[in-house]
From Swiss-Prot:
It comes from Bdellovibrio bacteriovorus (strain ATCC 15356 / DSM 50701 / NCIMB 9529 / HD100). NAD(+) binds at residues 48-52, 97-98, 129, 152, 189, 310, 334. NCBIfam families: dnlj, PRK07956.1. Gene3D superfamilies: 5' to 3' exonuclease, C-terminal subdomain (1.10.150.20), 6.20.10.30, BRCT domain (3.40.50.10190), DNA ligase/mRNA capping enzyme (3.30.470.30), Helix hairpin bin (1.10.287.610), Nucleic acid-binding proteins (2.40.50.140). Zn(2+) binds at residues 429, 432, 447, 452. Keywords: DNA damage, DNA repair, DNA replication, Ligase, Magnesium, Manganese, Metal-binding, NAD, Zinc. This is DNA ligase. It is an enzyme of class 6 (ligase). PROSITE patterns: BRCT (PS50172), DNA_LIGASE_N1 (PS01055), DNA_LIGASE_N2 (PS01056). It catalyses: NAD(+) + (deoxyribonucleotide)n-3'-hydroxyl + 5'-phospho-(deoxyribonucleotide)m = (deoxyribonucleotide)n+m + AMP + beta-nicotinamide D-nucleotide.
Length: 684
């Protein structure tokens, strides 16, 4: 073949490749803009046919993907990834929960608290926005590229659902920003529009599949699918409203953040005409907004259950700080929940982990806010007596906070039959037949038998919970079965379970048994705070567990603490101190803790940063380690180290496991030291 021909042919191929690559970039941009116009602005500028032609051209070019950047291509939204399970992911900054209010009066009280804390009489400027009824989500952009999406989870650790979130067409895979920040965490809500939800349920019904109770359940269920093709087939939406961690950008107000999102392709409510987001000066304007949104709520294309009020100034937010897990500078003003009328068919009593007997009304099924309700809590005997609720009554029920069903009132109680007698909680525990006791000054009747089968089951369920020991493969049904088969009666029994014992149960296969044993094994390194919370001591919640861990530092010191010493712990009063001491003063319960330690449970106390062997050092993990990534992070933090979210000049060590990503190359370029899991352990 002549050299000249070869040169001409090669030159032509190179030119064609260059043109294809250029056209590919053009198509990505054009299609992404049309996606934004259609799915975010609801203002399509081309026909469906024209859009399909552009998409077909894109797919045709991508048949030969060599040299093409597919990471932000619209073709990546069609789904196809199928995961074996979800991986846990830690938020760089906690996703805090908000305090709730339910009336305009509460808004005035919130404003008064804010001004009092700031020591000012001047009106405070608030950003008022919608409280979406969806699934909270954090999108993480690195250098403008969407790299990860994490559910809220417990506020500290969520689940990585990137494979599904990338299928949502309103979410940009790449920010429309010429110089994107190195890191931008966008927080918002995944939801489903009412009209889309109705169509989805019609399709589900036509296909003989289970329908969803409401748009929120549909959105949450879709996001948690392991197969991203399912998510891609369902009409999910996203609205951004808050920041997580950010590098390379500064903001002065909450409104600035929303405007920034809107300007760079992240969906917000700003394009809507109904003034869904406003800046209000003083509580009067906030209340005006509250009533406005309450009025337009039925017309909105999506569900909301209230409004969120935030101090607009980020500097003032910093001054106000936090209270436990909630910011002082924000509150959620809920709307009155939807109600319905039904009949109380029976009243049954459930026994909780502290022995509390809780009456529950079994009702004729009725839909409230799109959800079929069949039972509602009656709280306690005083509540039943106050409302005079009897079996057979017609009642008004509502979903408190649009979630938990409760009985509001009895309809026409004066017209009920004479033989319909008042209801009284039984004097004996329905689970173990022990005498039930109502202590002086309390409204709750309790079973005081520590061996009550119901108390044991509920205590064990609490022990394995996500925020406690986090034994995620052991669910409520399995605990019921294990207890009924006398394989589980106390906490330490979890660590005595064998694969053979699990296989002896119905519907338990080899893989399932392996997963259960592995899950139990993985729970053996809890923090002291989690372990204390898991014990289920009355009045000791998650936050109190953290205070106790920070104060006593070791499990031994906690178990030995006197009431006087317990009273020195922040936010612990006489009642809580006595409850803790009653528990730690019981030799059988203390022996149970010792038994768990002997069975391999290693309880890690909090380490002061200056005391840790890794103090002052920053770490990032990439690839698969011999242990769970969250456990590795806990190990680093317990020894004073700090976890960073991305490779930067601030990073000291990149811990590399199997199949590492592109972070290794970036770290090498910045001169960051790269170490193995074994080298990290040696440093500790």
């Amino acid at each position: 073949m002549p050299d000249a021909f070869c040169r001409d042919w090669t030159s032509e191929m190179g030119a064609n490749y260059s043109m294809s690559k250029k056209r590919h970039e053009e198509l990505k941009k054009i299609i992404s803009e049309h996606d934004h116009n259609y799915h975010v602005l609801d203002k399509p500028t081309i026909t469906d046919y024209e859009y399909d032609q552009l998409f077909a051209e894109l797919l045709d070019i991508e048949k030969n993907p060599k040299g093409l950047d597919l990471s932000d291509s619209p073709s990546q939204r069609v789904g196809g990834t199928v995961l074996e399970g979800f991986t846990k992911a830690q938020h760089r900054l906690p996703m805090l929960s908000l305090a709730n209010s339910y009336s305009p009066e509460d808004i005035f009280e919130f404003d008064e608290r804010v001004r009092k804390f700031l020591n000012t009489e001047d009106p405070v400027e608030y950003l008022c926005e919608l409280k979406f009824d969806g699934l909270s989500m954090e999108l993480i952009y690195e250098n403008g590229q969407l790299v990860r999406a994490i559910t809220r989870g417990d506020g500290t650790v969520g689940e990585d659902v990137t494979h599904n979130i990338k299928t949502i067409k309103s979410i940009p895979l790449k920010l429309s920003h010429k110089n994107p920040p190195p890191l931008l965490e966008v927080r918002g809500e995944v939801l489903m529009f009412k009209e889309d939800f109705a169509r989805l349920n019609e399709t589900q019904q036509e296909n003989g599949q289970q329908t969803f109770a409401n748009p929120r359940n549909a959105a949450a269920g879709t996001v948690r699918q392991l197969d991203s093709r399912i998510a891609a087939s369902r009409p999910l939406r996203f609205f951004g409203y808050a920041l997580g961690a950010v590098e390379g950008e500064t903001f002065n107000t909450q409104k600035n953040i929303q405007e920034y999102f809107n300007d760079h392709g992240i969906p917000t409510v700003l394009p809507y005409k109904e003034d869904l987001l406003v800046v209000a000066k003083g509580p009067e304007e906030v209340v005006k907004y509250y009533h406005h949104i309450e009025k337009v709520r039925p017309k909105l294309p999506f569900d909301i259950d209230g409004v969120v009020i935030k101090v607009n100034s980020l500097r003032l937010q910093e001054d106000l700080g936090l209270v436990a897990r909630s910011p002082r500078w924000a509150t959620a003003a809920k709307f009155k929940p939807e109600q319905a009328q039904t009949t109380v068919e029976d009243i049954v009593v459930q026994v909780g982990r502290t022995g509390a007997l809780t009456p529950v009304a079994i009702m004729k099924p009725v839909k409230v806010g799109g959800v079929t309700v069949t039972n509602a809590t009656l709280h306690n005997q005083d509540e039943i007596t106050r409302k005079d609720i009897r079996i057979g009554d017609t009642v008004i029920i509502q979903r408190a906070g649009d979630v938990i069903p409760e009985v509001v009132e009895v309809v026409n109680p004066d017209k009920r039959p004479a033989d319909r007698l008042p209801y009284s909680i039984p004097e004996r525990c329905p689970a173990c037949d022990s005498v039930a006791v109502k202590a002086e000054g309390e409204v709750v009747t309790r079973c005081v038998n520590p061996l009550c089968i119901a108390v044991v089951k509920e205590s064990l369920k609490h022990f394995v919970a996500r925020r406690a020991m986090n034994i995620d493969k052991v669910g409520d049904r399995l605990i019921e079965t294990l207890v009924d088969n006398k394989l589980l009666t106390r906490f330490s029994d979890f660590y005595r379970l064998t694969k053979e014992q699990i296989l002896s149960l119905e519907r338990q296969g080899d893989k399932s048994a392996d997963n259960i044993i592995k899950s139990i094994e993985n729970s053996k390194n809890p923090t002291l705070a989690r372990f204390i919370f898991a014990l289920g001591i009355r009045f000791v919640g998650e936050q109190t567990g953290k205070h106790l861990a920070d104060h006593f530092l070791t499990i031994d010191k906690f178990l030995e603490a006197s009431e006087e010493e317990l009273l020195q712990v922040p936010e612990i009063g006489a009642k809580v101190a006595k409850s803790i001491r009653d528990w730690t003063g019981n030799p059988k319960l203390v022996d149970e803790v010792k038994a768990m330690i002997e069975l391999g449970v290693k309880i890690a106390g909090p380490v002061r940063a200056q005391e840790g062997s890794l103090s002052g050092m920053s770490f990032l993990i990439t690839g698969t380690l011999p242990v769970k990534r969250d456990d590795a992070k806990d190990l680093i933090e317990r020894n004073g180290g700090k976890i960073l979210g991305s490779v930067s000049s601030k990073l000291n060590y990149l811990v590399v496991g199997d199949d590492p990503g592109s972070k290794v190359e970036k770290a090498q370029g910045l001169g960051v030291k790269i170490i193995s899991w074994e080298e990290l352990q040696a440093m500790i």
